[in-house]
């Protein structure tokens, strides 16, 4: 895998801090990707060209981030045969709820997989799982990644909890301090 398999696109370069965790996880898994800015509103022709041509260049999955009206993921999905994963970006007024609803409420026939507001890491992981259909080594790496997640230690245990605080956890999770 050397040619980009995932296209990470955003409506503005100010979206990069939101998108960057997707790039980091793709890099961690060794998945080649490209990054670009294409706006559904400011550069619609460029956006449509990107969406229509991505598959001819070997891109397998497109991850699109947008805030506000967040038309980018849906418009790209309408113009490409590839799977599209939308990342809603939080802006100051509605904290990303407008973006989430805009991306998630697609008409029948124009699917966009949507992650949580600002959920770029999950978008990257979903892209990797999607690629796993074709690249079995990614399935193996994902299984290792999930196994390593079992080593996660909740941050609440070091804190002092009141003895009255109910803890709903199986005994295998450890004991309360």
From Swiss-Prot:
Molecular function per GO: 5-(carboxyamino)imidazole ribonucleotide mutase activity
InterPro entries per UniProt: PurE_ClassI, PurE_dom, PurE_prokaryotes
Protein EC: 5.4.99.18
Keywords from the UniProt entry: Isomerase, Purine biosynthesis
Annotated substrate binding sites: 12, 15, 42
Pfam families hit by this protein: AIRC
Keyword rRNA-binding: no
Gene Ontology annotations of biological process type: 'de novo' IMP biosynthetic process
Endpoints of the signal sequence: none
Family: Belongs to the AIR carboxylase family. Class I subfamily.
Top-level taxonomy: Bacteria, Bacillati, Actinomycetota, Actinomycetes, Mycobacteriales
Pathway: Purine metabolism; IMP biosynthesis via de novo pathway; 5-amino-1-(5-phospho-D-ribosyl)imidazole-4-carboxylate from 5-amino-1-(5-phospho-D-ribosyl)imidazole (N5-CAIR route): step 2/2
Function text: Catalyzes the conversion of N5-carboxyaminoimidazole ribonucleotide (N5-CAIR) to 4-carboxy-5-aminoimidazole ribonucleotide (CAIR).
NCBIfam families: purE
Catalytic activity reported: 5-carboxyamino-1-(5-phospho-D-ribosyl)imidazole + H(+) = 5-amino-1-(5-phospho-D-ribosyl)imidazole-4-carboxylate
Listed name of the protein: N5-carboxyaminoimidazole ribonucleotide mutase
